[in-house]
Amino acid sequence: DPSKSRGLGDVYKRQLSTLLVLVSQELGAKSDSSNSDSNDFIALESTADTPDPLSKECVDHSGLGRHDHSMLAIYINGEQREIPTNLGINTEICNQEGGNMHTVHTHDASGRLHIETAADVDMPLGVFFDIWGVHFNETGIFDYRVSNTHELIMTIDGVTNNQFDDYLLVDGKEITIIFQARS
């Protein structure tokens, strides 16, 4: 039965993927590396490889069920990372008149996220990183991964929050993501 073999293949793929992540984390910890730049042979799993379907939805400014804003700041080893201008606008996916913006996007480099949807739906923070095409969850951000030497911290209005990519964006909230050496 082809459907059974296809499903079994999916199980093996998930197991192999999990094994690769565990081996990568172990090798990364032993090499005391906090990102892939110094450890290029390790294939890092990325959340951007399996984007949330909401990251592929396109909108314009008319008929919105939701139009909210949150602020995002990202720090990697003490240095603030710039969030690109017009991220999620006129992309390969969202480029049509009347639908040239992704559901979460920026208009400038201030870190202000625009959450705009046709219906009033919950929007996970991970959708923004999927649109950006970069990794973000409890295991790390960009090519930086949590290890025995480095940690990932996220705060919402200064309060620690461990929801990471699953955090549902709320109007007016300030999100700070910090990747740093453990103290």
Segments and roles (model prediction):
Residues D10-S183:
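Ubiquitin-like/PB1-type beta-grasp interaction modules and other compact soluble beta-rich domains
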Residues D1-Y12:
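Single conserved hydrophobic/aromatic residue that forms the stacking wall/gate
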